[in-house]
């Protein structure tokens, strides 16, 4: 999906670069696949802020996405046709409404790049390499770009789901397949785990510029205040006479080193599946 540069009608449109949604579905979403979504504004069940800089966005409804193409061990569909591509306010990627050829049941999936209306999607058809086809990693040819990758067979895709992201199948080792993730990390994943062919849609999102603070607020993002601009009671780097640099190496509001300090547990069980760290 291309981006559009707004003309400088006013200060907020000057320099703004937004995704062009003109090719997306303009009607209502599929009612059967909607759930109410309550905004918690970054608070937990005790009402305390656990995620900062969240809150104040417009009301949205959650779209039920089929991250797994299977239900109770059986495929949701073997063949399905794409009815339309839609905007989803809950994620950066676009979503596709697909309908099963046999039962006519609708489903939402993450739309891969290049998918369009009337395309036919397949599940476990191993000779179909079209974008949106789903199959086990063990059946994906080496060098193929994939997304929505499972970590456990049947659990649904957990990796590579954001706009424009993709992973690449590069090798096989026994019951495992070596996959290069968007971070550059090379990880072994069970060959029986499913993945979807192609890269995720809306790759141009990385080129956008919101142009004004209000657009961030529409998305539920509240302002982020620098620690050195706070008082000592609010942040370890706060206080001082005049403008100061904080007086110490950068830390989080809770005193943990930030700016690149590695926090992963070296004894984590999944470390044995990681063959190469992030670039």
UniProtKB/Swiss-Prot annotation:
* Keyword Ribosomal protein set for record: yes
Keyword list, A-Z: Ribonucleoprotein, Ribosomal protein, RNA-binding, rRNA-binding
- Could you tell me the superkingdom of the organism this chain comes from? Bacteria
The answer, when asked if Ribosomal protein is one of the entry's keywords, is: yes
Stored PROSITE patterns:
RIBOSOMAL_L2
Q: Which SUPFAM superfamilies match?
A: Nucleic acid-binding proteins, Translation proteins SH3-like domain
Question: Can you supply a Gene Ontology BP term from the record?
Answer: cytoplasmic translation
Region described as Disordered: spans on this chain: 227-279
**A Pfam family reported for this protein in Swiss-Prot or TrEMBL:** Ribosomal_L2_C
Q: Which Gene3D superfamilies has this protein been placed in?
A: 2.30.30.30, Nucleic acid-binding proteins (2.40.50.140), Ribosomal protein L2, domain 3 (4.10.950.10)
A GO molecular function held by the record: rRNA binding
Cite a GO CC annotation: large ribosomal subunit
Q: Which family does it belong to?
A: Belongs to the universal ribosomal protein uL2 family.
Chain's role: One of the primary rRNA binding proteins. Required for association of the 30S and 50S subunits to form the 70S ribosome, for tRNA binding and peptide bond formation. It has been suggested to have peptidyltransferase activity; this is somewhat controversial. Makes several contacts with the 16S rRNA in the 70S ribosome.
Subunit info? Answer: Part of the 50S ribosomal subunit. Forms a bridge to the 30S subunit in the 70S ribosome.
Name used for this protein in its record: Large ribosomal subunit protein uL2
Q: Which organism is it from?
A: Neorickettsia sennetsu (strain ATCC VR-367 / Miyayama) (Ehrlichia sennetsu)
Q: What gene does this protein come from?
A: rplB
């Amino acid at each position: 999906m291309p981006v559009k540069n707004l003309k400088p009608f006013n200060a907020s449109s000057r320099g703004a670069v937004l995704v062009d949604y003109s090719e997306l579905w303009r009607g209502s979403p599929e009612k059967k696949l909607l759930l109410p979504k309550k905004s918690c504004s970054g608070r937990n069940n005790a009402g305390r802020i656990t995620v900062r800089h969240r809150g104040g966005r417009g009301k949205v409804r959650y779209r039920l996405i089929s991250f797994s193409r299977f239900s109770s061990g059986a495929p949701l569909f073997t063949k399905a046709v794409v009815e339309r591509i839609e905007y989803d306010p809950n994620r950066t990627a676009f979503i596709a409404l697909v309908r099963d050829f046999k039962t006519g049941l609708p489903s939402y999936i993450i739309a891969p790049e290049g998918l369009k209306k009337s395309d036919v999607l397949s599940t476990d058809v191993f000779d179909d390499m079209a974008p949106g086809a789903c199959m086990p990693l063990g059946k994906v040819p080496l060098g193929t770009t994939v997304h929505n990758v499972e970590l456990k067979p049947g659990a649904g895709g957990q990796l590579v789901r954001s706009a424009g992201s993709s992973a690449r199948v590069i090798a096989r080792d026994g019951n495992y397949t070596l996959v290069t993730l968007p971070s550059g990390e090379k990880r072994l994943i069970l060959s029986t785990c499913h993945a979807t062919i192609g890269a995720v849609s809306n790759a141009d999102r990385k080129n956008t510029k919101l142009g004004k603070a209000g657009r961030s607020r529409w998305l539920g993002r509240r302002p982020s205040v620098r620690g050195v601009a706070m008082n000592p009671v609010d942040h370890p780097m706060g206080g001082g006479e005049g403008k100061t640099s904080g007086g110490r190496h950068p830390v989080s509001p809770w005193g943990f080193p930030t700016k690149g300090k590695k926090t992963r547990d070296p004894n984590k069980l999944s470390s044995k599946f990681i063959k190469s760290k992030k670039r």
